[in-house]
Amino acid sequence: MFISPDWMCTQEEGILIMEQYDVIVIGAGVVGSAIARELSRYELKTAVLEKELDVATGNSSRNTGMLHGGFTYKLGTLRAQCSVEGNQEFDKVASELGVPFKRTGKLVVGFTEHDHQNILRFKANGEANGVKGMRMVDADEMHRIEPNAGGNFAMYVPSSGILDPFQYTIGLAENACHNGVHFYFGSRVTGIKQIAKDTPDMALLIKRNPSISGKEDLYEVTTERAIFLARWVINSAGAYANKIGQMMGYPHVPQYGCKGEYYVLDKKAGQFLKIPVYPAPNDQGGFVTHATPTVDGNILVGPDWYDTEGPEDYANQKQSLDKLFTDGKKMFPKMARPYFIRNFVGIRWRNCNPITKEALDFRIDTNAGIPHTISLVGIESPGVTAATPLARRVAAILL
């Protein structure tokens, strides 16, 4: 992964004063990397600042690795639009990047009449969203598709698939890098300041770094290592998007953290499951524990969901893991404890109604009072599926 070897900067009191960029993207998760790749198509000088030492160290890699169909998301929302678009184009994207992907399809299984009605409701919603090919199947057909699925009936979603979200993010970032984007790791953003042209602050900036023209307003983005300058700043900081957004001048967006735990099953179990098996959505359209094969031959069982306050609260809880076993066995009856080889945690930061906690849509915010800034907040599931369509929307604002 490229980290600019020649930072072309001046140094003052131990702080590196960077060259000027057209665009700075904050965050090298899957969405930030997709934005960087999209912007690399244009004649823009772009940098990505990431607080960790590699891409996708946060929740971009702490998920099921599912290419979602888009049938549970509310019609007309950004989440629904980008999920369906991202799904439809993913074969092409995966081929361009050379990353592993299998369009396996997915079974959404049910046990009760209530499950059946919920599945039918979300099937109709998916069709309205543009999801193609969904069909209801009885137990016999369900077991022809996946012999080891639990359930009495199912909806088959042929457009769903599986991928490695870490390799996918690496592919996006490497492609951006090959096209000239600079990635700076270990670069935690500590401050963002707008500097107007023809002001004392701009004069001081030019004095510190004479390569700056000073003919247009700039943003000074300070990290623990250096000061970066750019005409545009894009916030794609994931769990820290609210914090970065407030540094930029955006108001706080009400959110809650939703923590989910997973079991990873040995590849010996992988031979028994070739297609993801999900439970019927609940009344709100959310899923609980499901069983999903990985592109490497393991199986992921999870997640459960409970609230958390910590953006990096990745500790497991025994009671949650016990529940995963019980719930996961309903989806995948061949699951057994000897297959468990490790566990991990992911966290969704959901935009929500501050009173009811109703989950709200993805946000791509702009503000006329903070020109040349874009703030993406609450990009949780299906963020991996939606990453490239989100990136196109960001580029359309900027260009």
Residue ranges and their predicted role:
Residues G14, A34, F362-L399:
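C-terminal lid/capping helical subdomain adjacent to the catalytic/cofactor pocket in oxidative enzymes
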Residues Y21-V48:
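N-terminal Rossmann-like FAD-binding beta1-loop-alpha1 element of flavoenzymes
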Residues R37-E38, L97-K102, I227, N235-P371:
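Active-site substrate-recognition segment that forms the wall
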Residues R41-S61:
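Glycine-rich FAD pyrophosphate-binding loop
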Residues G65-I145, G151, V288-H290:
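Dinucleotide-binding Rossmann-like beta1-alpha1 core, especially the glycine-rich loop
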Residues T72, S160-I162, N282, G286, ...:
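Glycine-rich phosphate/pyrophosphate-binding beta-alpha loops
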Residues R79-V84, V109-N118, Y156-E174, Y184, ...:
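Short beta-strand to alpha-helix junction loop
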Residues M155-R231, T388:
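Helical element adjacent to the flavin cofactor pocket in flavoenzyme catalytic cores
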